A protein has these predicted regions:
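Helix-rich interaction surfaces within compact, conserved domain-sized segments
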Residues: 73-128
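C-terminal motif of bacterial Sec signal peptides marking the signal peptidase cleavage site
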Residues: 11-14
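N-terminal secretory signal peptides
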Residues: 17-74
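Sec-dependent signal peptide recognition
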Residues: 1-9
């Protein structure tokens, strides 16, 4: 019984946040003010580019002046380092239920680095 308890305690310790550790929230993420109701999906045709801000945050910009901030429901490991991702959809929309795959480009061993669930698309005004 002691062996099982020790094994379980070690396994659970790996899931606990580290004291003083980096939680993946970037210190330089620009402030954003909500500008309307959050949306489940946005048209991929309307999206012009995206900016990965940290392990939790992606800002999408459409062809006009609209920005959408997606705060991922969980930290997406690798996203803050590689700052690149891909997605596949059979629809013409990217939705909060879709999965993104973190990508590493360049150098040997590049390629997919893990996948993460999306969040809601919050229309925002990005601060300077």
């Amino acid at each position: 019984m002691k062996r099982i308890s020790l094994t379980l305690a070690i396994a659970l310790a790996g899931c606990a946040p580290m004291a003083g550790g980096d939680d993946g929230h970037g210190k330089n993420v620009p402030a954003a003010r909500a500008d309307g109701a959050a949306r489940n999906c946005v048209s991929v045709i309307a999206l012009h580019d995206s900016e990965v801000r940290d392990y939790w945050t992606i800002d999408f910009h459409d062809h006009g002046k609209q920005w959408y901030r997606v705060t991922l429901p969980q930290r997406c490991n690798g996203l803050g380092n590689y700052r690149a991702f891909k997605y596949e959809t059979s629809l013409s929309e990217l939705c909060n239920t879709d999965i993104i795959t973190v990508m590493e480009f360049g150098g040997p061993g590049g390629g997919p680095r893990g996948s993460c669930g999306m969040g809601m698309f919050q229309p925002v005004e990005i601060g300077k």
